[in-house]
């Protein structure tokens, strides 16, 4: 997963705030869907410096490193087909829709970006932060 944005304004968390990731729950751990990083409940992770990069001045700013997550996640259910769901990731209003069909093994995990962490957020509600903590809370898709 690569964070991208026209603007890359670094922010520092004034307080803890919640974010969400898609992945797998394995025992007491959460494994992210894209990078397969394993998070332990309520354990601090290594702080990762965030470096926005633009190949050319007119390119989107991109950040590969850091902890990638979403500001919001909403799930649309269809009673006539319980194996089909629309997952609204990022910003429910301006974010994007990801369709997960028959992915009953996936979970939405709740995480905290701790106070003092650096982070960037784009217009799609995607967040990349220098630190993240898994709360141990999840919802099965």
Indicate where each model-derived feature is located.
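Conserved NAD+-utilizing ADP-ribose enzyme module
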Residues: 1-65, 73-141
């Amino acid at each position: 997963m690569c964070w991208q944005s026209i603007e890359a304004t670094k922010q520092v968390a004034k307080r803890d705030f919640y974010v969400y990731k898609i992945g797998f729950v394995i025992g007491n751990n959460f494994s992210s869907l894209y990078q397969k990083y394993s998070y332990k409940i309520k354990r601090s992770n290594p702080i990762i410096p965030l470096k926005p990069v633009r190949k050319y001045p007119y390119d989107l700013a991109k950040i590969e490193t850091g902890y990638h997550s979403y500001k919001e996640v909403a799930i649309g259910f269809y009673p006539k087909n319980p194996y089909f769901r629309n997952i609204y990731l990022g910003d429910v209003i301006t974010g994007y829709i990801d369709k997960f069909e028959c992915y009953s093994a996936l979970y939405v995990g709740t995480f905290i970006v701790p106070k003092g962490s650096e982070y960037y957020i784009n217009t799609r509600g995607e967040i990349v932060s220098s630190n993240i903590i898994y709360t141990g809370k999840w919802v099965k898709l």
